[in-house]
């Protein structure tokens, strides 16, 4: 059964401004440690940040809490499975919070085109 659905659209120019403002610290405020390493090596850091930010916001909306503890941006990670499909990776605290609410499966889709990044999350119980 569907627990929640969330979507988010991010303007890549917004993340470009974020990167200019925060410089090397830009990723630390939004990303997990694993994502920060990927961000530092990415050819298009603002696009990378926009896609990750959209995914995290979409997850928080699907969860129904918004971005508040324990669903903080740095507790919600995005990785890829062996085929390259995007997957959500939660901190231990957030994973326990989700499990306590009966969430058994998480689905994530991310897309970007020119000036925007979009993410869609479905949580199942």
Swiss-Prot record:
Could you list this entry's UniProt keywords, alphabetically sorted.
Cytoplasm, Fatty acid biosynthesis, Fatty acid metabolism, Lipid biosynthesis, Lipid metabolism, Magnesium, Metal-binding, Transferase
Bridged cysteine pairs (disulfide)? none
Annotated residues for binding of Mg(2+): 8, 57
Give a Gene Ontology cellular component term annotated to this protein.
cytoplasm
Broad enzyme group:
transferase
GO: which molecular function terms? holo-[acyl-carrier-protein] synthase activity; magnesium ion binding
UniProt-listed SUPFAM superfamilies:
4'-phosphopantetheinyl transferase
- Assigned EC number: 2.7.8.7
Q: What are the BP-aspect GO terms?
A: fatty acid biosynthetic process
Per its record, the protein catalyses: apo-[ACP] + CoA = holo-[ACP] + adenosine 3',5'-bisphosphate + H(+)
Q: Which InterPro entries match?
A: 4-PPantetheinyl_Trfase_dom, 4-PPantetheinyl_Trfase_dom_sf, ACPS, Ppantetheine-prot_Trfase_dom
Q: Gene3D superfamilies from the entry?
A: 4'-phosphopantetheinyl transferase domain (3.90.470.20)
Q: Which cofactor does it need?
A: Mg(2+)
Q: Its principal location?
A: cytoplasm
Location in the cell: Cytoplasm
Q: Pfam families from the xrefs?
A: ACPS (PF01648)
UniProt record similarity statement:
Belongs to the P-Pant transferase superfamily. AcpS family.
- What functional role does this protein have? Transfers the 4'-phosphopantetheine moiety from coenzyme A to a Ser of acyl-carrier-protein.
Q: Which HAMAP family match?
A: AcpS (MF_00101)
Name the UniProt record assigns to this protein: Holo-[acyl-carrier-protein] synthase
Record organism: Chromobacterium violaceum (strain ATCC 12472 / DSM 30191 / JCM 1249 / CCUG 213 / NBRC 12614 / NCIMB 9131 / NCTC 9757 / MK)
